[in-house]
Amino acid sequence: MNFGGFIMGRFDEKIMLVTGATSGIGRAVAIRAAKEGATVVAVGRNEERGAAVVAAMEEAGGKGEFMKCDVSNKDAVKALFAEIQEKYGKLDVAVNNAGIVGASKTVEELEDDDWFQVIDANLNSCFFCCREEVKLMQPSGGAIVNVSSVAGMRGFPSAAAYVASKHAVSGLTKAVAVDYATKGITCNAICPAGTDTPLTERSSADIKTRMAEIAAQGKDPMEWLKNSMLSGKTETLQKKNATPEEQAATILYFASDEARHITGSIVASDGGFTTY
């Protein structure tokens, strides 16, 4: 039943993992999925925010729990999935959402630490999780949705590490789809553009700093900004950012049984940002 935009019962009896679940898009996914019947394992690093997500899921009439994990740490990820296996015995849906934007720098400006911080948070975390997810899903199938970015579909200035990591997530998504299609596992990537989340706010602050640096070099910061990854609401056809709830609706469609025939797709959820 569709109730106020929610599809009640869509995820009944499903065990769903959501990483990066304590804020932004991940939080919206966890709350809506719980409302639609899933038992949600909300994963993040902040216990206080994790408890708040669980409370929000329960307030929405759903159920779930918080499991603390740094998903960029392969041993921590193995321990996380061992706990899920022991407690639930299966995994039906996984939304790999954890990630960062990182330093706004060109290739020559990036230090090694800048690079590896973003690769660990965005790509390695997704790989570590996918590797464990397919093991738990293979007996009965499942759905994996990786949250990539429009930066996984095109390039942007001063975002070398982020663009590389998100293109790699899109590639990993296709590889998983190819390897596990006959085992009943779908794997798709959603590529948001501007979305009103704490991550976007932090990135916007970093971009303001970057614009000041460009101006100090005698260059036009507005020329740089209009091509940047976070160039603002006016750069989408819809002239607005998405809400986390709008992105969650798209993600959960691909996580649902309604999308069983879709796999290996890299889907722009970007208000038309990548059409021009």
Curated annotation (Swiss-Prot):
Catalytic residues (positions): 162
Gene3D superfamilies: NAD(P)-binding Rossmann-like Domain
InterPro entries from the UniProt entry: NAD(P)-bd_dom_sf, Sc_DH/Rdtase_CS, SDR_fam
GO terms assigned for molecular function: oxidoreductase activity, acting on the CH-OH group of donors, NAD or NADP as acceptor
UniProt-listed Enzyme Commission number(s): 1.1.1.-, 1.1.1.393
Catalytic reaction list: 3-oxo-5beta-cholan-24-oate + NADPH + H(+) = isolithocholate + NADP(+); 12alpha-hydroxy-3-oxo-5beta-cholan-24-oate + NADPH + H(+) = isodeoxycholate + NADP(+); 12alpha-hydroxy-3-oxo-5beta-cholan-24-oate + NADH + H(+) = isodeoxycholate + NAD(+); 7alpha,12alpha-dihydroxy-3-oxo-5beta-cholan-24-oate + NADPH + H(+) = isocholate + NADP(+)
Biological processes, Gene Ontology terms: bile acid metabolic process
SUPFAM superfamilies per the UniProt record, alphabetical: NAD(P)-binding Rossmann-fold domains
Keywords of this entry: Lipid metabolism, NADP, Oxidoreductase, Steroid metabolism
Pfam families, alphabetized: adh_short (PF00106), adh_short_C2 (PF13561)
Top enzyme category: oxidoreductase
The family this protein is said to belong to: Belongs to the short-chain dehydrogenases/reductases (SDR) family.
Function: Involved in the modification of secondary bile acids into iso-bile acids (3beta-bile acids) via epimerization of the 3-OH group through a 3-oxo-intermediate. Catalyzes the reduction of 12-alpha-hydroxy-3-oxo-5-beta-cholan-24-oate (3-oxo-DCA) and 3-oxo-5-beta-cholan-24-oate (3-oxo-LCA) to yield isodeoxycholate (isoDCA) and isolithocholate (isoLCA), respectively.
PANTHER family recorded: DEHYDROGENASES, SHORT CHAIN, ESTRADIOL 17-BETA-DEHYDROGENASE 8-RELATED
Name recorded for this polypeptide: 3beta-hydroxysteroid dehydrogenase
Gene source species: Mediterraneibacter gnavus (strain ATCC 29149 / DSM 114966 / JCM 6515 / VPI C7-9)
Lineage: Bacteria, Bacillati, Bacillota, Clostridia, Lachnospirales
